[in-house]
């Protein structure tokens, strides 16, 4: 019986001990007195850190840059070459006059073996898709719900036409890229796949499966491409690609894929329609054929960034080392740090 009473007496003591321990931990947390590591940055440790950063970043940069260079690209600027000689001095007349033929043929020579899939991009330069008025001129709710969503004032000045609402509304949709390309090799047409060129998340969650183009490009001023009114927006992937606005003034957008290998020395014939007006703002248009690698497409920026950071780290470590050898300074008393850790 006494043993039972003894155990009952110990229970309150144990619970009070736990409460005091929790309150002490809470007090230390609130007063910022928790145990912490407070390293002392000595010259040797700083030099070592910068040197290690250089030894790690430079190999990563070389590997990344090598992988980027393994991606093969063919780049062809066609916006000037596709203008007839008599219109070179008046490009706006050429692009705005519908009676002037816009068809053009370009020949791209394959320098290195290009393994399928070969991605087709169009590139626009000096095109500010990130302009605030341009970016805001859209209605994401309308793209998802169609006419069920009527608050489209943000789409001005392309909100309505002839008194009827426009679907899809806004300047971004109105100015959609409308140059077209067909490819052939040795008089044999190359099939271009235009499926799965848009992000899956965009197709499934940002563009409605029951939303169809209505009253689109029916105004007096036609901006760019027209959309098939019989196909829902979620299935018009070239439109979905265009609606993802770029952050920089030069950008690429995926047009399609060639699912055949291209051998060195072969010539790819490109028949294109030069419809899109970039001449009014001194823009440029380019056609790109590109392979991919384990990092994606060709982009030297990441590799160069690693090399610059790694090289800078080594240079900084060498400068610190020379300064330390030339003007050494005695270490300060760090006993205060040891005392705080022990407490």
UniProtKB/Swiss-Prot annotation:
Keyword Thylakoid in annotation: no
Major location (coarse): membrane
Residues carrying a glycan: 103, 178, 191, 218
Tissue specificity note: Expressed in roots, leaves, stems, flowers and siliques.
Membrane-spanning intervals of the chain: 43-63, 301-321
Subcellular location: Membrane
InterPro entries per record: CDC50/LEM3_fam
Keyword vocabulary terms for this entry: Glycoprotein, Membrane, Transmembrane, Transmembrane helix
Superkingdom of the source species: Eukaryota
Keyword Transmembrane set for record: yes
Membrane topology: Multi-pass membrane protein
A GO cellular-component term linked to this record: membrane
Family the UniProt entry places it in: Belongs to the CDC50/LEM3 family.
Official protein name in the record: Putative ALA-interacting subunit 2
Classification lineage: Eukaryota, Viridiplantae, Streptophyta, Embryophyta, Tracheophyta
Gene: ALIS2
């Amino acid at each position: 019986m006494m043993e039972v009473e003894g155990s009952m007496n110990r229970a309150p003591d144990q619970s009070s001990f736990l409460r005091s321990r929790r309150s002490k931990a809470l007090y230390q947390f609130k007063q910022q007195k928790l145990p912490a590591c407070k390293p002392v940055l000595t010259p040797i440790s700083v030099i070592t850190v910068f040197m290690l950063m250089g030894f790690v970043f430079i190999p990563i940069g070389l590997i990344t840059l090598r992988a980027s260079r393994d991606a093969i690209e063919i780049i062809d600027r066609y916006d000037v070459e596709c203008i007839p000689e008599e219109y070179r001095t008046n490009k706006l007349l050429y692009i705005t006059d519908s009676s002037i033929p816009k068809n053009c043929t370009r020949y791209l020579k394959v320098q290195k073996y290009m393994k399928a899939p070969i991605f087709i991009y169009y590139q626009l330069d000096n095109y500010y898709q990130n302009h605030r008025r341009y970016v805001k001129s859209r209605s994401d709710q309308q793209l998802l719900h169609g006419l069920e969503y009527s608050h489209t004032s943000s789409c001005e000045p392309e909100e309505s036409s002839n008194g009827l609402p426009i679907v899809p509304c806004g300047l971004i949709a109105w100015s959609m890229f409308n140059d077209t390309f067909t490819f052939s090799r040795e008089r044999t047409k190359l099939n271009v796949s235009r499926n799965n060129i848009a992000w899956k998340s965009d197709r499934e969650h940002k563009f409605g499966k029951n939303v169809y183009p209505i009253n689109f490009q029916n105004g007096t001023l036609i901006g760019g491409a027209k959309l098939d009114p019989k196909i829902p927006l979620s299935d018009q992937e070239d439109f979905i690609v265009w609606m993802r606005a770029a952050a920089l003034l030069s950008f690429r957008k995926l047009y399609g894929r060639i699912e055949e290998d291209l051998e060195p020395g072969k010539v790819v014939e490109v028949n294109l329609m030069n419809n899109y007006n970039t001449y009014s703002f001194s823009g440029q248009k380019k056609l790109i054929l590109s392979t991919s690698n384990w990092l994606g497409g060709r982009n030297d920026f990441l590799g160069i960034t690693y090399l610059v950071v790694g090289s800078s780290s080594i240079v900084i470590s060498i400068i610190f080392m020379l300064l330390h050898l030339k003007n050494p300074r005695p270490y300060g008393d760090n006993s205060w740090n040891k005392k705080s850790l022990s407490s």
